C-alpha cells in the first residue's frame, strides 16, 4: 500500500530525535520518535527505556489523585490486557502533587528504566503529565482491544512543562444539532489527550433547548424537539447529493409524534452530573451557556411573560428576545440559572449576550418604562442593563460571568470576562483589557471550526499573535484561546469530529506552548505523527489538504504534478476522466508528467477505507497570453459597490449601485459596509513573461477573471477560504475583474507571486 509522502513537507527537525531503546535489560531495541502535542516546554533525553509490564503498579502520594491513577490504569490496561493496580504510596508509576513552577497545570515527568514519576502543581497538572506519558507510548496503546506482540516501551526522558494560558477550550453547540452523552464524552477524551481543559457547553438556542430545568418542564418537553428546519433539510440534501452519510440526520435523534417527524433530544440533570464527573476526572471544567437575552426562541415560545409580546418568531435578522422590561422575564432567567449554577460546580457561567433583535424592545411599553426608570437612552443600553442585572445575580451565586464580545458595547463590570469572536471588531481585545477585564480569544476567522477548512486554516490558528497591540499588562489579562463548533451544518458526531480535528490540535498547542517554541514545520511533523493514534481511537478526523498543486495550474511545454499529504496513514487515488476516485482507481505513487491539458481528481482514503475529500485540479498547457497595446493611465483599481444580498458573484451587477471608489489594491473600501457586492476592475501589470499565481482569500464569495478567462472560482457563501489559480501572461497590462460579496464583516485579499515564488508588491501591479 503506497502512502502519502508526507516527509517531503517537513524541513525542520524534531525536538527529540530517534532514541535507540536497548538499554533496558531484556528489552529488544525499539526505535521511537519523541513526538508530543502540544510541544513540551523542556524535554531532555536520557539513557534507557521504561517498559510497562503486567506487574506495573500505579501509586499516589496524595489521595485526591486516586481518580487520576484509575484513569491512567484504565487507559493502559485496555490495549495491554494488564490488570494494573492502583495503590497509595509509591508505585512503579507514581503520581504526586508538588511545588512545580508555572500556571495551574504545570508538571514534571521523569521516566527511567525502572520507574516513572509525575508531579503536578494541581490535579490538572498531574492529568497533563499523564497525557504526555500516554503520547510516549506507541499509538497502539489507544486500542480498545488487547494488542499482542507490542513492546510497551517508552524512552527515558525528563520533562518540565507548563501551560502558556489557563484557558484552553472547545465549545460545542448542541442546540442546532444534538449530541448524546456518549458523543460528548468522546470529544472530552480528545480534549484531554491534547491538554485542553475548558469545555464550553452551548446548551440552548433558538433551534432547541437541551437541558432539563425542573421548574419549567415545557423547555424540554416541547423546546427540545422541532420539525426539520432549513439546516436539517440542507444537511439531508448534501448527504444524498454528495453520497456523504456523515451529513445525514441520525435516526436516534428522530421521533414520530402524532404523525409528525420531530428532531431533537435533551439531557436530564442526572446526565449533566454524569458528564461533569467524567470531565472532572480528565481535568476539564465545564462552562454552561444559556444564551440570553437573544437566541431564546425555545423559551419564549413556551412560556408567557418571557417575551415582549405573545407573538414570537423572527425579526428582521434575529429571533424575538427576552423582554428586559418585564419582572416576570427576569425572574424566569434567574430561575433557570439557579438550577444551572447548582449543577455546575465551577467559577464561570456564560450568558451569551450576542446577536439580539431589539425591534420589539422599541415598541414594548415595559421596555420603554425600564429605560425611563433607569435613565437609559438606547436599546443597546437596555441590553447592557439586562446583562449587568444578570451578572449581579451570578455574583450572588458565587459565579463570574462570561459573554460574547457584544457585552463590551454597554460597558463592562470589573468581574466580566469577554470572549472575542467577531474578527472584524479588531479592537475588542484591546478595549477589554484596557478596562482591566480578562479576554478569551476565539475570533471566528480562525477559531470557528464549523467553517470549511483549507490548506491555510491550521497555520492561521497556529500563527495567531495574541499579543498584537497589547501592553505587557494587557497581555496578562488574556485567559486563553478557544475553538468553537457551531452545528447548524454539522448533524452527526462523525461530521463534528471531521470539522474539528485536526484543527483542535493547533488550538491546543497555541494555548499550551510558549510563543518562542512556535515552529510551523516542526508542528506539522508532530501532527503527522498523531494520525495513527487518532485512527486507532476511531476518531473521524479530516485528512489535511493535499498539497503540491493549485485549483488551476498553468505550464508551458511540459509540466508535472507532485502531490504531498501530511497524513502518512492515508492513501491517495486519482482519475483523469472526471469520475470520482474509488479504492479501485489508480494509486498516486509519485510525480506524474503532464504534457497536455489534464483534469485530475484526487481522493484520500483512511486506513479503514473511509473516503476523504475529493479534490479537483486542472493543469492547462499554455502560451503567454499577449498584453493589451494601450497602457492605462491611472494607478490602482476601481471598485463599484452594489447593495447586494445574494450569494452568487455573477448576480452582483443586478443590485443597485451605492458608490464607486478608487483602491490601490484588492480590498474592501473603508466606507463599504453592510450588504456588500463589489466589482473591482482594472488591469494587471505583468512585470515580465511568466506564469503568475493568484491566491484569492475571501469571506464570503469571490471570483477572479484575467483576459476574459476565470482564474479563481471562490464563489458561494462561506467563511474565510483561499483558492489559488495560475495563468501564463506576457509582459504588460491585462484586463482583470474581481467580484466579491458578503453580508457581515468579511475578508478580501489577493496575493500574487511569480514562478520564483516571491510575492509581487501591489504598488506596481494594477492600473485602470
Where are these regions (language model features)?
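Short beta-strand-plus-loop segments that form exposed binding edges in beta-rich domains
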Residues: 737-746, 752
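Acidic, contiguous N-terminal accessory segments
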Residues: 24-166, 397-404, 408, 412, ...
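Flexible, acidic glycine-rich loops studded with aromatic residues
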Residues: 401-406, 411-416, 422-562
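Hydrophobic faces of well-ordered beta-strands that scaffold small-molecule active sites
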Residues: 168-172, 199-201, 286-290, 349-351, ...
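Feature activates predominantly on carbohydrate-active enzymes
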Residues: 102-104, 110-321, 326-330, 337-348, ...
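Short, compositionally stereotyped local motifs that mark structural "simplifiers"
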Residues: 8-12, 514, 518-682, 691, ...
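Active-site neighborhood of glycoside hydrolase catalytic domains
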Residues: 299-304, 310-415, 422-431
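Bacterial Sec-dependent N-terminal signal peptides
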Residues: 1-33
Amino acid at each position: 500500500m503506497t502512502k502519502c509522502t508526507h516527509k517531503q513537507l517537513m524541513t525542520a527537525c524534531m525536538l527529540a530525535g530517534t532514541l535507540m531503546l536497548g538499554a533496558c535489560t531484556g528489552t529488544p531495541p525499539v526505535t521511537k520518535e519523541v513526538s508530543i502535542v502540544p510541544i513540551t516546554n523542556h524535554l531532555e533525553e536520557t539513557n534507557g527505556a521504561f517498559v510497562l509490564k503486567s506487574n506495573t503498579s500505579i501509586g499516589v502520594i496524595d489521595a485526591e489523585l486516586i481518580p487520576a491513577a484509575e484513569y491512567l490504569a484504565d487507559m493502559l490496561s485496555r490495549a495491554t490486557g494488564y490488570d494494573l493496580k492502583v495503590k497509595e504510596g509509591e508505585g512503579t508509576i507514581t503520581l504526586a502533587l508538588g511545588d512545580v513552577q508555572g500556571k495551574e497545570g504545570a508538571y514534571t515527568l521523569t521516566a527511567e528504566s525502572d520507574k516513572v514519576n509525575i508531579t503536578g502543581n494541581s490535579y490538572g497538572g498531574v492529568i497533563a503529565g499523564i497525557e504526555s506519558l500516554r503520547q510516549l507510548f506507541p499509538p497502539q496503546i489507544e486500542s480498545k482491544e488487547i494488542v499482542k506482540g507490542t513492546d510497551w516501551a517508552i524512552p527515558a526522558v525528563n520533562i518540565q512543562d507548563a501551560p502558556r494560558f489557563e484557558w484552553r477550550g472547545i465549545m460545542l453547540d448542541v442546540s442546532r444539532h444534538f449530541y448524546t452523552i456518549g458523543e460528548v464524552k468522546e470529544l472530552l477524551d480528545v480534549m484531554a489527550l491534547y491538554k485542553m481543559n475548558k469545555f464550553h457547553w452551548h446548551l440552548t438556542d433558538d433551534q432547541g433547548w437541551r437541558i432539563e430545568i425542573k421548574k419549567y418542564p415545557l423547555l424540554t418537553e416541547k423546546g427540545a424537539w422541532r420539525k426539520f428546519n432549513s439546516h436539517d433539510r440542507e444537511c439531508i440534501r448534501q448527504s444524498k447529493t454528495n453520497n456523504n452519510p456523515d451529513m445525514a440526520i441520525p435516526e436516534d435523534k428522530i421521533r414520530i409524534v402524532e404523525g409528525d417527524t420531530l428532531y431533537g433530544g435533551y439531557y436530564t440533570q442526572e446526565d449533566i452530573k454524569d458528564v461533569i464527573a467524567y470531565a472532572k476526572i480528565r481535568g476539564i471544567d465545564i462552562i454552561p451557556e444559556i444564551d440570553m437575552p437573544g437566541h431564546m426562541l425555545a423559551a419564549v415560545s413556551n412560556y408567557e411573560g418571557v417575551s415582549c409580546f405573545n407573538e414570537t418568531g423572527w425579526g428582521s435578522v434575529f429571533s424575538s428576545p427576552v423582554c428586559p422590561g418585564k419582572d416576570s422575564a427576569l425572574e424566569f432567567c434567574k430561575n433557570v440559572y439557579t438550577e444551572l449554577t447548582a449543577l455546575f460546580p465551577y467559577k464561570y457561567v456564560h450568558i451569551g449576550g450576542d446577536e439580539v433583535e431589539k425591534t420589539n424592545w422599541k415598541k414594548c411599553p415595559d421596555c420603554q418604562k425600564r429605560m425611563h426608570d433607569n435613565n437609559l437612552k438606547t436599546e443597546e443600553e437596555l441590553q447592557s442593563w439586562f446583562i449587568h442585572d444578570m451578572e449581579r445575580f451570578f455574583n450572588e451565586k458565587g459565579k463570574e460571568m462570561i459573554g460574547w464580545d457584544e457585552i463590551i458595547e454597554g460597558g463592562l463590570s470589573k468581574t466580566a470576562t469577554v470572549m472575542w469572536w467577531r474578527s472584524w471588531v479588531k479592537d475588542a481585545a484591546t478595549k477589554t483589557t484596557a478596562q482591566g477585564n480578562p479576554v478569551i480569544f476565539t475570533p471566528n476567522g480562525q477559531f470557528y471550526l464549523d467553517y470549511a477548512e483549507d490548506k491555510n486554516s491550521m497555520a492561521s490558528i497556529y500563527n495567531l499573535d495574541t499579543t498584537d497591540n497589547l501592553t505587557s499588562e494587557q497581555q496578562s489579562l488574556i485567559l486563553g484561546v478557544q475553538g468553537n463548533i457551531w452545528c447548524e451544518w454539522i448533524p452527526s458526531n462523525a461530521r463534528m469530529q471531521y470539522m474539528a480535528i485536526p484543527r483542535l490540535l493547533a488550538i491546543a498547542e497555541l494555548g499550551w506552548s510558549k510563543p518562542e517554541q512556535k515552529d510551523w514545520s516542526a508542528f506539522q511533523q508532530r501532527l503527522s505523527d498523531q494520525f495513527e493514534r487518532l485512527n486507532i481511537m476511531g476518531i473521524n478526523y479530516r485528512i489535511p489538504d493535499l498539497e503540491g498543486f493549485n485549483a488551476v495550474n498553468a505550464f508551458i511545454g511540459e509540466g508535472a504534478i507532485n502531490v504531498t499529504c501530511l497524513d502518512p496513514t492515508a492513501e491517495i487515488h486519482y482519475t483523469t476522466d472526471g469520475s470520482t476516485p474509488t479504492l479501485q482507481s489508480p494509486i498516486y505513487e509519485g510525480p506524474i508528467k503532464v504534457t497536455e491539458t489534464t483534469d485530475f481528481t484526487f481522493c484520500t482514503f483512511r486506513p479503514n477505507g473511509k473516503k476523504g475529500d475529493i479534490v479537483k485540479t486542472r493543469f492547462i498547457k499554455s502560451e503567454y497570453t499577449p498584453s493589451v497595446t494601450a497602457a492605462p493611465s491611472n494607478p490602482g483599481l476601481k471598485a463599484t459597490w452594489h447593495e447586494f444580498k445574494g450569494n452568487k458573484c455573477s448576480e452582483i451587477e443586478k443590485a443597485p449601485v451605492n458608490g464607486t471608489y478608487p483602491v490601490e489594491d484588492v480590498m474592501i473600501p473603508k466606507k463599504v459596509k453592510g450588504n456588500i457586492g463589489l466589482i473591482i476592475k482594472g488591469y494587471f501589470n505583468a512585470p515580465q513573461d511568466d506564469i503568475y499565481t493568484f491566491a484569492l482569500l475571501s469571506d464570503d464569495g469571490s471570483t477572479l477573471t484575467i483576459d476574459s478567462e476565470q482564474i479563481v472560482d471562490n464563489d458561494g457563501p462561506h467563511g474565510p477560504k483561499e483558492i489559488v489559480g495560475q495563468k501564463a501572461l506576457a509582459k504588460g497590462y491585462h484586463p482583470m475583474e474581481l467580484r466579491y460579496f458578503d453580508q457581515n464583516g468579511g475578508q478580501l485579499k489577493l496575493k500574487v507571486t511569480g514562478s520564483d515564488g516571491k510575492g509581487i508588491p501591489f504598488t506596481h501591479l494594477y492600473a485602470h
